Amino acid sequence: MLNIEKVKITTLSENSVADIDYIAEWGLSIHISIEGHQPILFDTGYRHACIYNARVAGIRLSEIDKIVLSHGHADHTGGLRSVLEVIKYENPNRKHIDIICHPAAIESQHVKHTDHYFYRGCPYYIDELTRLGARFKISSEPTWITEDILSSGEVPMKTDFESVAPICYLKKGNQYVNSTVEDDQALFILTNKGLIIILGCAHRGIINTVLYAREITKIEDVYMVIG
């Protein structure tokens, strides 16, 4: 387990800021730095805030080892292209960066308002991102990022008081199919003080996610839940 003092978590994009030097936007991006390991980026925000804020904070995105996507909605994947471009610019010799996500994260995701469907998935073609060095590692199962960091994969729906908003849909062919946001996942960091659980939107429920974290890590103590 990691010593908690070796873990540094920096929010690079969120819908509010605590300092006028930074900018806010819809969505989320979190930089995770652990002593002795290359950093990890959890989500990329909606547009460019994570890039701007990383520069203000003195964080070099080219040092990121992997990008983990909490799910496919645009406010978490919209910064992908810009992040990959910055990595390529800062380190032209780098060939690939792994992007870890659920299979549904790259499907055609929509939301329904009144009688209309609006696209809310990743705003880029997968081929477009792979040309910039993205190497997709796609799985619905838990995936070890390091020996102490685990992506949850698909979170089981166990509680009877948490549910997915009925406005989420996947477009399959010409049909819109109701989605339970199966791609929603979290990061679990195993530390000497307990689990740090990093959420995206937690579409499948915060409590469901915490219960699953305890189940697959066999650690009962939860030190922190953020996201």
Stretches found by the model and what they are:
Residues 65-140, 153-164:
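Active-site HxH/HxHxD metal-binding segment of metal-dependent hydrolases
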Residues 49, 74-77, 106-108, 143-144, ...:
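Active-site environment of divalent metal-dependent phosphoester hydrolases
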Residues 66, 73-79, 97-98, 177-186, ...:
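Cap/insert and terminal regions of metallo-dependent hydrolase folds
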Residues 14-15, 44-47, 72, 103-105, ...:
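Active-site metal-binding loops of divalent metal-dependent hydrolases
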Residues 22-23, 35-66, 81-82, 88-90, ...:
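Pre-active-site segment of Zn-dependent metallo-hydrolases
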Residues 113-119, 141-192:
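Active-site-proximal loop/helix segment associated with metal-binding centers of metalloenzymes
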Residues 60, 136-145:
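Short acidic low-complexity segments
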Residues 6-57, 180-199:
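Conserved beta-strand hairpin/beta-sheet module of binuclear metal-dependent hydrolase folds
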